[in-house]
Amino acid sequence: MPIRIRWTSREYFGSVLLLLGLSGMSQLYFIYIGQYFLAIGNHIVSIIIPIGIWVALFYSTLIIFESYAQVERREKLRSRFRKTIIKSSKIKKFLNFPITKPILIVFILFNIFFFSSFFISILFLSNTIAFLTAEVISAIFCLLVANLIERNYGRVRRI
């Protein structure tokens, strides 16, 4: 079943705004890296391209969030009469919060793919082109992983 993104529903509007803001905050970090550590003076590469990457990261976190929300809704319907777990650790509560999973997945994957592709492409290209290539490659990988998570984890099986 394809994911339906409920942008304006009362239940998810605050979560969507949080995902949008956190995706933008991650790109501010990469804009800072590009301008000050890599000395990229081209404003198109250092500011406008990360805005496009911001939209791609937001969309991938939204896809992952919606797939986890779908599974959570299904589990709530199934586990209405089960016993509740009394004690859980703070890190488990933090990781079970529905917004943290997609944010952590996308940010960790983006950082891994960005720095690995940047260090490989810096051997052959200039700083500006290597930064641009690394951002685009890592955003594409994040979208592919979000699609895989949506297909494998968020699948609703009808019996």
Sequence positions of predicted segments:
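Cytosolic-side membrane-entry/anchor segment at the start of a transmembrane helix
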Residues: M1-I33, I149-I159
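Alpha-helical transmembrane spans of integral membrane proteins, capturing the lipid-embedded, hydrophobic core
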Residues: V16-G24, I47, I51-V55, F107-N111, ...
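Hydrophobic alpha-helical membrane-embedded segments
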Residues: L17-L28, I33-V71
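Alpha-helical transmembrane segments and their membrane-interface junctions
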Residues: G24-F30, T100-L132
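Alpha-helical membrane-inserting segments
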Residues: M25-Y29, L57-F65, S116-S121, F141, ...
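Juxtamembrane/interface segments at transmembrane-helix termini
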Residues: T61-R74, N147-I159
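Short membrane-interface loop/juxtamembrane segments of multi-pass integral membrane proteins
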Residues: L77-I103
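Alpha-helical transmembrane segments and their immediate juxtamembrane interface regions
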Residues: S126-I159
